[in-house]
Amino acid sequence: MVHLGPKPAQKRKGTFTDVSPQLLEALKPIQEQFTISADKLRAIVKHFISELDRGLSKAGGNIPMIPGWVMDFPTGKETGSYLAIDLGGTNLRVVLVKLGGNRDFDTTQSKFALPAHMRTATSDELWDFIAKCLKEFVDEIYPDGCSEPLPLGFTFSYPASQNRINEGILQRWTKGWSIDGIEGKDVVPMLQKAIKKVGVPIDVVALINDTTGTLVASMYTDPEAKMGLIFGTGVNGAYFDVVKDIPKLEGKCPSDIPPESPMAINCEYGSFDNEKYILPRTKYDVQIDEESPRPGQQTFEKMISGYYLGEVLRLILLEFAEEKKLIFKGQNLDKLKVPYVMDASYPSKIEEDPFENLSDVADLFREKLGIETTEPERKIIRCLAELIGERSARFSVCGIAAICQKRGYKTAHCAADGSVYNKYPGFKERTAQALRDIYEWPADVKDPIIIVPAEDGSGVGAAVIAALTEKRLKEGKSVGLLGA
């Protein structure tokens, strides 16, 4: 038995005999900078652990480490019907989740397209729209009405502070939203008021982050799940810590939240290493950071998330073409000069090209960028995409290893979601290999820590958290800070 995990990613077996010595020479420093050794990964993990600890301290640190106020592990025996909503960038998702009590569930969902003006509408327009969609959904599912109020979990993936699980004070809008009168205020009573107006029996019992939802949903179905992870446009992790090991909660919890109580932590660790201490940044990473809307922030995210993979490739290609005059000679580079013109689909398609002459890459550059490529150029493009994808995957596991080592997990299922995890070629195999490199597990044993596909965090996760919260509230237990 060897590993039984994903096999290492296959690199293209092609010769570089037709690639010019000058181009091969230019590739060497890129290969050196983007190849991350096992020793370097272990050093990053060690620093990551100290940053996680700092985030939990009273003084705080780069990583926010936000208590999620989920203080019970799901057992898988939870039952009942729960609503969940997820306010995305283009639609509102409404889900009815029926928890079966045997680590099983059944879902019914609808998506409601957001009107074009909604992201800059008034506060009342937003909440009234959500309430109207909820009423339409509930009336269809329960034409004869509900016998008792439906508990609702609200996935709100915008920066919000919480002193208890059934509140969320919006810090600032992101993702193109800009509605006046909501920032700095608790969104839960606003939604509850709108729901009351339409006369539908719904109680908003929990407001959650999607990563915390991923953690809890996966724990409901998988007793080995220890972590929820997002690898997509953003990166994040969530896990359960213990109240007594969270110094910033010292003296702030009610007496019915004992020191041994578990506490879900939404890490928001895209901000790891904002002080530029450990991550080996290239000049391309520095340029991306300096030209970003928030320089100096989200350092870790900018080196691994899907949003930046294509931009790193674009910057290297532009340097090879414009400064070094090694590729795309005599071509119009106007489209290539547009920042972020190459999204994550570019390196993804480049790595997926199954043809020996990389004809898919040729089509991609011709159709999207107006650039005719030679076969040697395409080999270099492919090699660069592999280097960038490999680096992203290897960095991605550092948060996993750090949390496992911090909590003393020797075995774990780490439940992952997001476009990079689900769609980027080779990502699963590369992350599995990176974990082996960090831990140096024997080759003849099954990998004890593995990344697995997550359950639906914003739907099932929100519902399970609503179930756990409803149980606490019925028992008269606290769901937040002392006095909150």
Curated annotation (Swiss-Prot):
Record has Transferase as a keyword: yes
Pathway the protein acts in: Carbohydrate metabolism; hexose metabolism; Carbohydrate degradation; glycolysis; D-glyceraldehyde 3-phosphate and glycerone phosphate from D-glucose: step 1/4
Alphabetic keyword roster: ATP-binding, Cytoplasm, Glycolysis, Kinase, Nucleotide-binding, Transferase
Acetylation listed as a keyword: no
InterPro entries: ATPase_NBD (IPR043129), Hexokinase (IPR001312), Hexokinase_C (IPR022673), Hexokinase_N (IPR022672)
E.C. number(s) listed in UniProt: 2.7.1.1
Location in the cell: Cytoplasm
Region entry Hexokinase small subdomain, spans: 75-208
EC category name: transferase
Example of a GO MF term: glucokinase activity
Hexokinase domain: residues covered: 21-467
GO biological process: glucose 6-phosphate metabolic process; glucose metabolic process; glycolytic process; intracellular glucose homeostasis; mannose metabolic process
GO CC terms in record: cytosol; mitochondrion
Stretches for region Hexokinase large subdomain: 209-456
Reactions accelerated catalytically: a D-hexose + ATP = a D-hexose 6-phosphate + ADP + H(+); D-fructose + ATP = D-fructose 6-phosphate + ADP + H(+); D-glucose + ATP = D-glucose 6-phosphate + ADP + H(+)
Pfam families hit by this protein: Hexokinase_1, Hexokinase_2
The family this protein is said to belong to: Belongs to the hexokinase family.
Task performed by this protein: Catalyzes the phosphorylation of hexose, such as D-glucose and D-fructose, to hexose 6-phosphate (D-glucose 6-phosphate and D-fructose 6-phosphate, respectively). Mediates the initial step of glycolysis by catalyzing phosphorylation of D-glucose to D-glucose 6-phosphate.
Miscellaneous note of the record: Has antigenic properties. Elicits a specific immune response in systemic candidiasis human patients undergoing malignant hematological disorders.
Subunit structure, interactors included: Monomer.
Protein name: Hexokinase-2
Organism: Candida albicans (strain SC5314 / ATCC MYA-2876)
Native organism taxonomy: Eukaryota, Fungi, Dikarya, Ascomycota, Saccharomycotina
